[in-house]
Regions:
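Donor-binding/catalytic cores of nucleotide-activated saccharide
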Residues: 85-88, 106-219, 224-241
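Boundary detector for helix-to-coil junctions that initiate low-complexity/charged tails
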Residues: 320-402
């Protein structure tokens, strides 16, 4: 190859835009990064670039990735000081050249045809975002399960306009990026970035992109595997960064206020805040949970009182109880305890009444059985058979006489 031809080849390579840019933020993921990258590099869709942004790892993560770059030219390694996954994803987007963006966590992995399925849906339907089903994997037990609370009540293999899901956006989709493919041009025009937060840094980007998308399509197939119960994951240390979720909530609420459908979006958002907060209060240490609830108080007080504004009584009850101060909550808890005791007595009385009625029913069944037995005895007696034999001819004569 001449020098000129080599230059032309290099220029052509640089001008070629891969179909998908896979962006992987990685922090101390030496135990999982090889499996993650192997699942990406073995995709049936080969026209991809893989951008790994090492977020200041202190283990062998970066060196493992660097070794792989020598084997596969589609991998790029970017290093940065530890600034969190949100900043790492933004860094990856800055250099991404693909028509589509896919964000994968360094401890997760994907099915061999994941990117092909996602791109096929996006290309055929013109989607700004494509979402597919995912499966959870317990890192301690090896248990797997379908994440069936994602893609809740959505149609598949068709273009969904925001008008379909705007009033239940936060219930139909989850606030993580790894089950979604994004059209890069759409993300660039939206100006959306991941928040620079230690945890919950993806919720703002994901939910706001769903608000702004021209159309979303969904694939009814498990394409992603999400590792849970990973002790090295930052999600396992949320007590150190509980405020990040609050910051994400406030940013999302601000974005909602700018939208034409803000009223419908806010109703869905309120229900999400309540359920997410219920999970947080249930999983955070008690002292941290108190701080969380204190920070959330302004949002709770702004939520409507009527039960019709909530997905179910569960959310309405959460809002009602969480918005009470300590003294009112004590009174409410005492009242509920009394109500529970009264209901227990009512249940006991009803059970006793059911037992009494069952006893009467058994007695009636016994009487009916006795009568049936007596009737059978009559039919089988000699006197009945003799009488029946004598009367039968007379009945026949009487019938002919008519």
């Amino acid at each position: 190859m001449t020098g000129l031809n080599l230059v032309i080849t290099i220029i052509q390579d640089r001008l070629h835009m891969p179909l998908v840019s896979v962006i992987i933020p990685a922090y101390n993921a030496e135990d999982y990064i090889s499996q993650c990258l192997s699942s990406v590099l073995s995709q049936t869709l080969s026209d991809i670039e893989v951008i790994v942004v090492d977020d200041g790892s202190t283990d062998r993560t970066a060196s493992i990735v660097e070794e792989l770059t020598h084997r596969d030219g589609r991998i790029r390694l970017i290093r940065q000081e530890n600034q969190c996954a949100g900043v790492a994803r933004n860094k990856g987007m800055e250099v991404a050249e693909g028509k589509y963006l896919y964000f994968l966590d360094a401890d997760d992995w994907i099915e061999p045809d994941s990117l092909e399925k996602l791109c096929s849906s996006a290309e055929s339907l013109g989607s700004d975002i494509v979402v597919a089903r995912s499966e959870g994997f317990d890192n301690q037990t090896g248990e797997t399960w379908l994440i069936d609370y994602a893609l809740n009540g959505v149609p598949f293999d068709t273009l969904i306009r925001p008008s379909f899901y705007v009033d239940r956006l936060f219930q139909r989709f989850m606030g993580w990026p790894w089950d979604k493919l994004y059209r890069a041009e759409f993300i660039q025009s939206s100006g959306l970035l991941f928040q620079p937060l230690r945890t919950t840094n993806d919720a703002y980007f994901v939910f706001c992109s769903l608000m702004l998308a021209g159309g979303v399509s969904c694939v009814d197939k498990v394409l992603f595997h999400h590792r849970a119960n990973n002790r090295k994951s930052l999600e396992g240390t949320r007590s150190k960064s509980w405020h990040c979720a609050i910051e994400a909530m406030w940013a999302i609420a601000k974005k909602i206020a700018e939208q034409p459908e803000s009223t419908r979006l806010m109703e869905s958002y309120n229900n999400w805040v309540l359920n997410y907060s219920y999970w947080s209060l249930n999983t955070l240490p008690a002292d941290i949970a108190d701080l969380y609830l204190e920070e959330l108080a302004p949002a709770l007080s702004a939520m409507p009182n009527g039960i019709e504004s909530y997905v179910s009584r569960h959310e309405w009850t959460l809002r009602t109880l969480a918005s009470l101060n300590q003294s009112k909550l004590l009174v409410k808890a005492t009242d509920l305890s009394g109500d529970r005791e009264n209901l227990s007595h009512e249940i006991a009385n009803l059970q006793a009444e059911i037992a009494r009625l069952n006893g009467e029913l058994d007695s009636l069944r016994g009487e009916l059985a006795d009568r049936d037995s007596k009737i059978r005895e009559v039919y089988s007696s000699h006197s009945y058979k003799l009488g029946h034999a004598l009367l039968t001819p007379l009945s026949a004569v009487k019938h002919r006489g008519k």
